[in-house]
Curated annotation (Swiss-Prot):
Domain of life: Bacteria
Entry-linked Pfam families: PNP_phzG_C (PF10590), PNPOx_N (PF01243)
UniProt gene name: pdxH
Source organism of the structure: Paramagnetospirillum magneticum (strain ATCC 700264 / AMB-1)
Name of this chain's protein: Pyridoxine/pyridoxamine 5'-phosphate oxidase
Record's cofactor remark: Binds 1 FMN per subunit.
Amino acid sequence: MSAPEADPLVLFHKWMDEAEKAEPNDPNAMALATADAEGRPSVRMVLLKGADQDGFVFFTNLESRKGQELAANPHAALCLHWKSLRRQIRVEGSITRVSDEEADAYFATRARASQIGAWASIQSRPLTGRFELEKRVGEFAAKFGLGKVPRPPHWSGFRLAPRRIEFWHDRPFRLHDRFDYVRDGDGWHLEHLYP
């Protein structure tokens, strides 16, 4: 790996651009780790939908397990791993909800079937069978007909404001490169870590 950038977001976007060219499926897939109010962790894959100086954005059902955990404990970590590139990025930080306007704008870009699915899925609740879900999808499809599907009140997005971003690049004999950026006021403090 060449000398790291002073701004981790510049390096992040370079790596993401390379991942989008190299990864066949969902290069923006990331493991999102949350914890409940008692500190019990859970992790799942979600899709990164935006990254800038304000943070890393993803969208979800607010009533899901992750939504409830983020409401109770607004701290999280995410990890993007691209096996074909032998790279990984880990991010830690605090969580805030995106604005209703931002959530509405993203929701409007989703496929209609995904919009209806956001209404139909009572995410993380027990499901007696596939037919129950398909029935709910049909009910909401009939409700909205050919009209616009509004964003459900229980569906929005979160922004992880990074306080630490670590870039890992595989090297022979486990002598990997690790560059750790820690928020320092308005800038970043960079350290090269032992593998």
